[in-house]
């Protein structure tokens, strides 16, 4: 009945500025002005926004203040293009077509477009050309603007300021200026140009008073991910003719692939499950880069040794197939490469066709090894401060040599392809580009329930659009030292990967990592022999309250399970077996122990984590793959059912009901294509020991004089050593505290200052005065520009080293 929809952008400025410097997206001439000929790039911004959404009829009924009406919208992907950072007219025009068809709005009636327009020369020209191509068909020249001229590029929240500006304009009947626009660009055929670009605030066009004011808002993301929203002015008049969403259908799983630990393909994964084996091994030699031998770090982690786990040591990939450079120092990170491999194989298994309207949904979390780059950058100041405290005097060249040895031993200097692969949403777009898919490409992060949320989103896409299929992929290389450092705060890791006497009695978690993908279509669109299993019902429930306990979570499990069973149209007695979350975290296991046996009395309960460990963001896909393979083996006239339970760090519960089909799955016949060349290389996770690399480089001649400078000094403990306190795991007794009841302080701390807050609120204006002059419309302090420039220059200096 009501929904909160919001966005936030507040990433570490060091990573943001480093990234855009590598992408050469910052203006060399320090001019950032969307749609201006002299603009050479963008400025990054930060911020957040939130909107409350209701059905139009409900809002009118309840007497709510309506700010605007969302008539419709659409998503698309560029598919095959030049490069993941380069926009493509094909995908942008397609999203306009889909959006106005979805909104049932005539493009002739569009008054204003709030553009994506970032200020980058190529991006602005491509977007202007896309609008020319689309709107010239309808002989319409809408007014154009970009809020990025005021606020910069808010990255993950880029659409929120644009929507806010468009909604404000619809309400006020005035369109704000795009500031700093002095020399406007024009579209290729001169259809759109200066006349449409507002340099002053103007009244809303009044060419047709009988039609509602209409605006479009565009957002175009890295990787060719496109979105367009159609907004109209608030109205109390209700629509009498509108389409309804298609009826929900069960989702048939028609293609799969997986790589968990040493089980590197679907056949080996199936054998693993059939024989009830596991993939637990000792830590591979290169995985932690020798950190497991650092006593201080291991003591801080409360580990006497690296835990056994389902580690991925290496995997092979065809670089020519995926069109990525095989440069060791500028290669995509393993997280993206592994996801691409399993998603590609799943698409082949399903027999998908290139160029189809297929959506790609990827469940993932940030690759925590990214922090190695922060460590690399921090070494510059850490070494400088240490030398100063020790009284060691080195020449500038010697300091640089010493610093470079330390930095290169941690990580190579960031380069374009590698740094690009840390951007999560590009992960899905790479598959769309490989297969030339035009459907939405979305990454979704909801921790352990990420895959289940992808399945829910797939249901929604099938009901509200005309997509042909959805690829759902997930990856989590959760065996890195960074991941284990983080997750030790939630619960104790199982050092020996040893099982407890009972699954739900376990109080430690096993390390697991890997990736998997599956393809779904509506059940009515597939033949029986194509199907591994069918997702008949999916439901979510939240166990979060003021004091989360296993009882609250158990109640959420029961609620989600009963809803899922009702959606699937079966009862609990029909369930053959239960796939539990079985994480090894205390309160999660306690909740399942309380709820699942009561729900499914006498049914066998197991968890894939006994075979492959806890894959966190990819844990859901492991459960689905296991259940689908088991159900495929049980294919017969009478269906078998499996219930899957999932629990997330946000205390939400997911519950799925899967069923078997009447026939065993048959892999789609491979199309006959011309044999192409291959370039298969092995990707090793981890690398050489950091300490060993430093020692090896310590033998070079340039260090002789540096060593003498140290040997002549009596070295003392540095006054501000790097602290290891923050990585120390909490006591086990504290591990049942959910994320929702904890507060993380990152960067600057927020002080409680009620007096200042009240003063700030009382002095704030409750309305905005609109002036016709740009200088009075929006003020952007020169100090803000200077801050951007200073940060950018600092980042450029750091990455050049």
In which residue ranges do the predicted regions lie?
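Flexible, low-complexity linker/boundary loops enriched in proline and small hydrophobic residues
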Residues: 199, 217, 230-231, 253-254, ...
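Condensing-enzyme catalytic core of the thiolase-fold
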Residues: 1-678, 682-685
